Amino acid sequence: MVRKTKGIVLRAVRYGETSLIVSVFTEDFGLQSYIINGVRTEKKNKETSSLFMPASLLELDVYHHEQRGINRIREAARYKVLHSLSEDVVKNNIALFMMELLFKSLKHPESNLPLFHFCEEILCRLNDGDRESASVFPFYFSLHLPHFLGFGISSPEKTIYD
């Protein structure tokens, strides 16, 4: 069944000569793996393979089956272009750190809308912010991620650092 969802690319791994296996944190299904055949051929333009770079915000049409470990993507397009993340090396590395931390933290394919919207917002803020303020994002993301996973600091009267 074809379903429409938004997703954040966490990682892409080459598979065979022309394919990619992409881990995507989706709005509706949580962490999912998708195989994209023929994306790395010479006939395809480079823009198609660049869609699946980590920290890309995509709108996806996917063939979703609950029982399968790896599904297929019918169509993918960016719904928010993050130019600054791809051009600035510092911001790119910060985004890669956050995507890797998120990938290592998510183990089950379950939807987590607040976490998805938090990640989407923090990537947009990192993209729109200046380079000097970018150094705060890894700490901010690391401190707030546990809250969305169910074991964060919840006491308002205690500070994080005493």
Feature annotation, model-predicted:
Residues M1-S19, F25-D162:
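Non-catalytic alpha-helical scaffolds and adjoining flexible linkers that form interface surfaces
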